[in-house]
Amino acid sequence: MQLKSQEMRKLAPELDPLRIGTGWTKEDLGKVQVMVESTYGDSHPGSGHLNILVEEVRRGIAEDGGFGARYNCTDICDGESQGTDGINYSLASREMIANMIEIHANATPFDAGVYLSSCDKGVPGNLMGLARVNIPSVFVPGGTMNAGPEMLTLEQLGMYSAKYERGEINEEKLDWAKCNGACSFIGTASTMQIMAEALGLALPGTALMPATSPDLLDFAREAGRQAVRIAQMENMRPSDIVTMDSFENAILVHAAISGSTNCLLHLPAIAHEFGIEITGDTFDKLHRNARYLLDVRPAGRWPAECFYYAGGVPAIMEEIKEHLHLDVMTVTGKTLGENLEELKNNGFYEKCDKWLQEFNKRYNINVTKEDIIRPYDKAIGTDGSIAVLRGNLAPEGAVIKHTACPKEMFKSVLRARPFDSEEECLDAVLKHKVQKGDAVFIRYEGPKGSGMPEMFYTSEAISSDKELGKSIALITDGRFSGASTGPVIGHCSPEAVDGGPIALVEEGDLIEIDVMERKLNIIGIAGERKSMEEIDQILAERRKNWKPREMKYKKGVLRLFSQHAASPMKGAYLEY
């Protein structure tokens, strides 16, 4: 098999001397050449340790006769940019990470790639990039943080912050992050690590391993070795591995873990790079009868490290195995079914249980695997975790994580309280200007409006209020943190800046939410119910007076993103 790197050496005589100038030896030049791309940087705990894993990957590559070249494009942290204009860059950064992988991989010849990241935009950016360049590739998840004292995890800080603003707690509760890794709850970072493994692009049993575990170093080294192997095999490119069946497997795992709603932005965008169409309807259809099994925060009891101690993605897949496509290929060169059988016999689950016992000792508790990942016949829920709502308010759809929503809010009629920015809305919530029975709207926060930031602080201010958390809804064309809980509906499409119906909502409109029937409608005006025909006529009149907003960003990457971003329900990827 002729390697791309060796063919390019013949075409570009300056390539060899330039590489020797960066530390390659003449012997290295003739080896399998692997790009090792990470989001390493001092940007946040999820990326700060990846340089250590990169060196383990390179060691594994060398052990199998290859040479690994280090590249990186660090990611930003949604947590660090929350509540500032910095959060507007978050979703756009996913596209930039994918773009840099394309540039790095195609500007210089490589035979394979290993990609390392941990967090919200790094993981989907890596997966989009590896799909686009389509060289044999292995993804290495960066793992999760350990929980802190009293089992505190980072998603609780939004709630604590709202309580602090209301004078309910002191400042001491607000400051903590223990170690490297993704935040220790099933937010977007954890969800996307799990999705990478569920798609077959990461080695089995690697998602959400504690970042402090020495086993993570071993897996990184093995990923390097595997990259060299698949570089020399036929039909082991990402496009040979990932199919529609792979995505269906991932979505069923997403249902079982009650994954982040942001996955409805990321999986469709990744699928788009593979030439596969995934829509909100795909999620909704598969979630409707899927088992929800994982009792991990934010919807459950335990920190995310417990997911790995209970057996991780393989343990989830074992429980839902009869619904999965077990014949899909994976980066091991074996099918999913073969991988699951091998893990039963190689001591993987015994090692996980050993870690669980250490966790129990740390907190003086007695948690079992079944407490964390419920057996299939004792599922937490039988209708998945995500619903896509539609109606005259969201013709293209809107997303709710119903497993994190109080059941009394599943069928509601509420009064509309529209705001044209999150700042206005958050101020109203904190000053008690939002009342029981309100449907709070935050609009002009979609991809084209402002980059589609998270409405995390507003959602936490609502859900941490004992009365508001069970009596009002938050509806937006923006998105929510994977840590968000409560009656929150995002991705409302079309977005306001495109003239979607959310832009036409007025104070006092009656809003119908029906989760089980998948409805989101305006059903009344000024507190009075109207027929759907009357509502349509009134909205048509309002549209005549609606004026498109001038584009918010005049230059830079957010100008580019807001000009070309697709609809939230398509994945908000760049459409050129």
What are these model-derived regions, one by one?
Residues S90-N99:
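Glycine-rich, highly charged phosphate/nucleotide-binding loops
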Residues H49:
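Glycine-/small-residue-enriched capping loops at alpha/beta junctions
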Residues A105-N126, F139-P141:
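A short, small-residue-rich loop immediately preceding and capping a beta-strand
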Residues M1-G46, E55-C73, G79, D85-S90, ...:
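Catalytic or ion-coupling anion/metal-binding cores of large enzyme and transporter domains
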Residues I52:
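Acidic/charged coordination and interface sites in well-structured regions
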